[in-house]
UniProtKB/Swiss-Prot annotation:
NCBIfam families: division/cell wall cluster transcriptional repressor MraZ (TIGR00242). Its main location: cytoplasm. It comes from the Bacteria. This is Transcriptional regulator MraZ. It comes from Burkholderia ambifaria (strain MC40-6). GO terms for biological process: negative regulation of DNA-templated transcription initiation. The lineage of its organism: Bacteria, Pseudomonadati, Pseudomonadota, Betaproteobacteria, Burkholderiales. The keyword rRNA-binding does not apply. The gene is mraZ.
Length: 142
């Protein structure tokens, strides 16, 4: 289970150091193998490989009228491995698609991660909070 936010920096080659609190879980759960793909909100999705296989099967089973979404998720997916320093390489194509340059935010979302450009994430979070809670959360207690 992945949760929490981490402010990180991409190096000049597009590598991101995975926070140590996640490395052991990624090694145990996925032998350090992850899959990175596009997210429709403008960030990237990072899945441990076993979770990716579950997601990929769901996407592959979508009806034909969702063929562009299959292309977006599956056609842009890249398999990467944690290197010996605990880093993953984010491809130039995926970095460009998500507007990632240097400062990024890694969010643990349970079974997977989202990777955002830091400024984009801050702006989208502020906009969401300004709109208030959606109806689905109106009766949710904290």
């Amino acid at each position: 289970m992945f949760q929490g936010a981490s402010a990180l920096t991409l190096d000049a080659k597009g590598r991101m150091s995975v926070p140590s609190r996640y490395r052991e879980a990624l090694q145990g759960q996925a032998e350090g193998r992850v899959t990175v793909t596009k997210h429709p909100d403008g960030c990237l999705l990072l899945f441990p490989r076993p979770e990716w296989e579950v997601f990929r099967a769901k996407i592959a089973a979508l009806p034909m009228d969702a063929h562009w979404w299959r292309r977006i998720f599956l056609g842009n997916a890249m398999d990467v491995d944690l290197d010996s320093a605990g880093r993953i390489l984010v491809s130039p194509e995926l970095r460009m698609a998500a507007g990632l340059e240097k400062e990024v935010m890694l969010l643990g979302m349970g079974s997977h991660f989202e990777l955002w450009d830091s400024q984009t994430y801050i702006a989208k979070e502020q906009a969401a909070m300004a709109q208030g809670m959606p109806d689905a959360l109106k009766n949710f207690t904290f």
